[in-house]
Amino acid sequence: MKEGTMKRLLKMLWSKYKIHLIFVVLCIIGNALFNVQGTMFMQTLIDDYIVPLLKSSSPDFSGLLHALIRVACLYACGVVCAFTFNRIMVYVTQGFLRDLRIDMFEHMESLPIRYFDRTPHGDTMSVYTNDIDTLRQLISQSIPQLISSCMTIVTTFVSMIILNIPLTVLSVCMLMVMLVVSRKLGSLSGKFFVKQQNDLGKVNGYIEEMISGQKVVKVFNHEEQAIADFRKLNDELRESAYQAHKFANILMPVTVQLGNVSYIICAIVGAILALNGHFSLTIGTLVAFLTLNKSFNQPIGQISQQINAVAMAQAGAGRIFDLLDQESEDDQGVVTLCRVETVDGKMVETDKRTGHWAWKHPRSDGHVELVEMKGDIRLEGVDFGYFDDRMVLHNVDVYANPGEKIAFVGATGAGKTTITNLINRFYDIQKGSITYDGIDIKLIKKDDLRRSLGVVLQDTHLFTGTVMDNIRYGRLDATDEECIEAAKLANADLFVKHLPEGYQTMLTGDGANLSQGQRQLLAIARAAVANPPALILDEATSSIDSRTEKLVQDGMDKLMHGRTTLVIAHRLSTIKNSDCIMVLEQGHIIERGNHQSLIKEKGKYYQLYTGAIEMD
């Protein structure tokens, strides 16, 4: 765990809710003072009212009644203060956690793809749920309790000195013993709370993975192995939790018993002093002091109770800050995408949907040049590896002229999808260059680069919402009519209109109520509504049956018309009309040409096409 985790958390809390926290502290001080005053008044109540009344033959209880009312008012004021600061802390807690979740989500959205490739999704979810909940307990309960306990110790200590110094010294000695014991037990359990939170994240990650892949688990009869793996992770969580709570849970009982010992010792010593008339110790003073002694020792027990919560919150905060400290996706691009129209023979920027695009390229002399968006995509001498010591692509050259359809084929792991990831700048290359209309893509803002590329990903992902919402995800300002037109273009309209509520049918669980082909069609419609200048179709038709594939291919041909298109497909029949087909093998392009020329060569592509060898 990084040092200063708790300091950083408290600094964030203070910066957002300074006024609220000041008012909370004032209320806590008020609560402590009113309670101490009530206890101190017991001395007056006993010595000045109760004892004289017991000795009087005709007692007058009016004075005692007024004294009791004063005590009741003091305690009532303490209750009001306690109620007020607790209500404020509830508001502060929920507001702070809301803001923190927003900060976490906004930062998560800025993280590079490699973070999600390397971090289990369930572990990230655990940060949003379990780790956030540890902060809820810390802010709403532990912090107020710790401040209240400290205030109680201070005010009680001062009051005890006023009443009797020898008994106060005795109480402080016992308090030191309690502090030493509490610190020792707390240090033994603290490090295990960090491991407990990490193990909890692993368990959640595994559960999320198993839920997502439950069909695969059942198809391959993997249930027993899945259960065994879960048992192992769960046992590790149980062990770390046991070690964390083994000492932490005995803190409260130990401190309570030490407090009782302190109370008994003070009672015995105080009684001896009172009976012998030392230090002017009256019955009222002794009763008030013993009550204060309870109040003096009780905060130590309360503090020990919060040690568990503080340790867990510190571990949770550490994981939260690990997420927040992840480096955001680097983007130093200056070139942006804009719509253009031709006015008096010149290209000018416009807000109209003209269907024509250009790159706004700021030059060193200060003027902005409009470069027509043609869709000329080139990779030259590209080397790339997800890890520096393991290259996935080797000296790759790809030339996609405007309006051309370029197809990539090859075995799984050959590097086809990696090429499209590089064009999107999900990853940056180690060597070579990638240009878009003659502009190095590192100069293009990532948002604009990706906006220019309509993508149908290999894994179709649909979001909870209506069919219309999922199509509109391609362009949020698209009208219903535009979404329907896009669906018709992808031939998705044929099945959507037969759904129970048509385009307003709710999809849940990643579109589990749709077939693979239907989900793929919606993904294509989503790309169509974006109306991008260029397209990347990653395994676009690999999940669609032959009949649906024919419908999709017809729609895709319309969508690809006039656009530069990069296609990855396992079904070679879908790419026969490509302008250029590139065959990849272990990160190298070993063949390139159109369908006819590659068939004539009778090389790897010919073998794939004739079925002599399998791609996967």
Residue ranges and their predicted role:
Residues 2-3, 26-27, 34-47, 74-121, ...:
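Juxtamembrane helix-loop junctions of ABC transporter transmembrane domains
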Residues 7, 81, 85, 93, ...:
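Hydrophobic alpha-helical transmembrane segments of ABC transporter permease domains
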Residues 15-18, 113-114, 132-139, 143, ...:
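An intracellular "coupling" helix at the cytosolic face of ABC transporter transmembrane type-1 domains
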Residues 16, 20-33, 74, 141-195, ...:
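Transmembrane helices of ABC transporter permease
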Residues 21-84, 161-166, 264, 268, ...:
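Transmembrane helix-loop-helix hairpins at lipid-water interfaces of multipass membrane proteins
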Residues 52, 159-173, 243, 247-318, ...:
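Helix-loop-helix
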Residues 57-58, 340-616:
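ABC-type nucleotide-binding domain
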Residues 94, 102-134, 205-229, 322-340, ...:
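Short intracellular "coupling" helices and adjacent cytoplasmic loop segments at the cytosolic face
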